[in-house]
Amino acid sequence: MSEQIVTSEIITPVVPDKNGKINLLDLNRQQMREFFKELGEKPFRADQVMKWMYHYCSDNFDEMTDINKVLRGKLKEVAEIRAPEVVEEQRSSDGTIKWAIAVGDQRVETVYIPEDDRATLCVSSQVGCALECKFCSTAQQGFNRNLRVSEIIGQVWRAAKIVGAAKVTGQRPITNVVMMGMGEPLLNLTNVVPAMEIMLDDFGFGLSKRRVTLSTSGVVPALDKLGDMIDVALAISLHAPNDEIRDEIVPINRKYNIETFLDAVRRYLQKSNANQGRVTIEYVMLDHINDGTEHAHQLAELLKDTPCKINLIPWNPFPGAPYGRSSNSRIDRFSKVLMSYGFTTIVRKTRGDDIDAACGQLAGDVIDRTKRTLRKRMQGEAIDIKAV
């Protein structure tokens, strides 16, 4: 086996859980080897345990039969393998599965999307989101905290456990992971990067770097750091052809405008092999907001110096949202303009919208620390009083 191992400089502090045990899902391979060294064991023991954890989805040390009984007993005293639990499952008519995952006293959502030739898992990185993109349900829930490594990789582990571990079924239960669930991944680099390293590691889930995708709304300093830490596929949530529109629907644009964002994207592409020289542009289609043919021409001009493919995403509604979904005819005209400029343009097929599992619909259960939901409720009450 050709080893793919941790290369980043991030070392997340390993903190025992309340029961005093180390959750091994919090450790990448470098940390696992250090942990076993502290136990007086050889580094290869870490590799053996990781193989059981991720290839077999085992959380029981007694199942690890190539490890001696004394070491298994020692591990049970000081460590555990504890992934977050599924507390609710919903299945779509198209085969998509949405899991509500308990993280402490809150919930995040994880989505499994099976297709004929692949199975993609959409993973959350935060409880809620601080960025307030106006068309996204998650953003309306407010923000509470970053997820730990074990809570991020634990979503992949739990999904693989449910669908069937690779060594049990003989097939990969998950072929692609997209960091496109709840939260902005670049605002949680300390935990997201080690989790992605486990996804890529041969003794982890062994995914190709082209099959692990991080999506960002444009936290430019963190994007520059990412390029020095790990090489994964990159998707960017652009959603507008100019700063005027993006300032309104993606507020972080007021801090890092489109030009600044795309400059950072091009810097990342220069460092990356995973992207095959181009980035994926995500563009949600909002009726009569950003979906006119004039917007398509502006977008083509904007992206002329950025190697990319463009995903057009029909907007998925949620209660209280002030937008409408673009009609098929408007999306078609928009797409044809982009293709006339030579851009690879794909209209994303909506999956799981009947269970609110589609793009922009994930909500979870968030104890909002930003007071955003309270402000919105008070504003709503004020409007109602005025209307009366």
From Swiss-Prot:
A GO molecular function held by the record: 4 iron, 4 sulfur cluster binding
Co-factor binding comment: Binds 1 [4Fe-4S] cluster. The cluster is coordinated with 3 cysteines and an exchangeable S-adenosyl-L-methionine.
Keyword Chaperone applies: no
Residues holding [4Fe-4S] cluster: C129, C133, C136
Record localization: Cytoplasm
Cellular-component GO terms for this entry: cytoplasm
Catalytic reaction annotation: adenosine(2503) in 23S rRNA + 2 reduced [2Fe-2S]-[ferredoxin] + 2 S-adenosyl-L-methionine = 2-methyladenosine(2503) in 23S rRNA + 5'-deoxyadenosine + L-methionine + 2 oxidized [2Fe-2S]-[ferredoxin] + S-adenosyl-L-homocysteine; adenosine(37) in tRNA + 2 reduced [2Fe-2S]-[ferredoxin] + 2 S-adenosyl-L-methionine = 2-methyladenosine(37) in tRNA + 5'-deoxyadenosine + L-methionine + 2 oxidized [2Fe-2S]-[ferredoxin] + S-adenosyl-L-homocysteine
InterPro entries the record matches: Aldolase_TIM, Methyltransferase_A, RlmN_N, RNA_MTrfase_RlmN, rRNA_lsu_MTrfase_RlmN/Cfr, rSAM
Cysteine pairings via disulfide bonds: C122-C359
Presence of the UniProt keyword Cytoplasm in the record: yes
Enzyme class: transferase
Function: Specifically methylates position 2 of adenine 2503 in 23S rRNA and position 2 of adenine 37 in tRNAs. m2A2503 modification seems to play a crucial role in the proofreading step occurring at the peptidyl transferase center and thus would serve to optimize ribosomal fidelity.
Family affiliation: Belongs to the radical SAM superfamily. RlmN family.
NCBIfam families from the UniProt entry: PRK11194.1 (NF008396), rRNA_mod_RlmN (TIGR00048)
Name of the protein in question: Dual-specificity RNA methyltransferase RlmN
Species: Citrobacter koseri (strain ATCC BAA-895 / CDC 4225-83 / SGSC4696)
Phylogenetic placement of the source organism: Bacteria, Pseudomonadati, Pseudomonadota, Gammaproteobacteria, Enterobacterales
Gene behind this protein: rlmN
